[in-house]
Amino acid sequence: MDYRKILQERLNQEIENLSISIETKNSLQNAIWGSLSFYTCLPIDILNSVPDSKKYLDQVIELSVSSSFYLVSLIMVDKLIDNQEKVNGAIVEYLFFVKEEAIKKLQNLFFNNTLFWKTFQSLKCLVFSASQCRCKDFEGDNEKLLTILLNKSALVKLYVVSMKLIVQEQIDWDNILESLKSFHIAFQLLDDYEDLKEDIRSGQLNYYLAQEKNVDSESEEVEVQLKKLMATEIVENGLMIARKNACLAYKAFGKMSMKHSQQVSSVLVKEIDFVLTDIHLLKIKAEAKAKLSNVLVKNNQLNIALLRSKAFIYNNQEIDGSWKDFLTLAGDGHNWITAFVISMFAEFEDNKKDLKKAMAWLGENGGKYNQNVFSND
């Protein structure tokens, strides 16, 4: 039976009754039924795998409402704090909301249950600890890395603990936990890919950055580091692991009649496939550029002109060496088009002024000739 409509009506009513602004209500609705809908529907999805599901429906709906409020509030408060100068009023609303509504609902549901509250506190500590990890401090193998990253979503285990307390029937809880683990591996690896730029700047622990030991977040530009990662197979391999786990979750959820979880897993597979296709096309483009840039100049007169150009540029470059990237990545002695153009600039006296203008422009832009080798430009 599809209990989603019942849950949706109840959540809409609960949100409408909250003493918060319309804007806040709308943001809650969007989060609950948007990016976090997997967790919103997880309790009723698990309920669908229970033979006699109707007798547990009321309590499970209560669990869905309270857990949705808590999880969405927790995540949105965290995002708001990052922009607190602009949204102080909204932060106050959400903090009040978490304390007075979400926690209160959980207390009403599991007031005297020691197991629930001990598990709750323990999992919250895991989430907090994982969120504080930084790439520069990480030491360990791939298994340890995944364990820490999965702790970011550790609260999902509380759904299973809660459902076991409500549903007094023997169902395959271990299989549910294993399926959730597969889903979250896929979700985390895709999320880390999407957050690469942000995590390079912040230094937050990221699956791909933790494996690339040659990345120096303190001395290199973000785009340069992204190119390093793309040039290796770290990102592609990680996303293949993500795809494998998303497919495992899709099959497992389907066998347990967890339709919404299966649907979200299907969307996850498609999103990963899209990224993998995009990366593959970018690599083909980069390889094509590399081949074109490695055509050796074999004309002696052009080589002589190129040497003059090289000498001119070296003599006129800034102390910071901003043209070094141009000379190396453009391919000193390679790519006859580049060679011809810069030779013509440097060979004739009248063109030196234009060359200086070009150098000034490149200098302002860091002299990065191959800046967009992995872009769609």
Enumerate the predicted regions with their spans.
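Primarily interfacial, aromatic-capped hydrophobic alpha-helices that serve as membrane anchors
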Residues: K104-F128, V215-Q262, N365
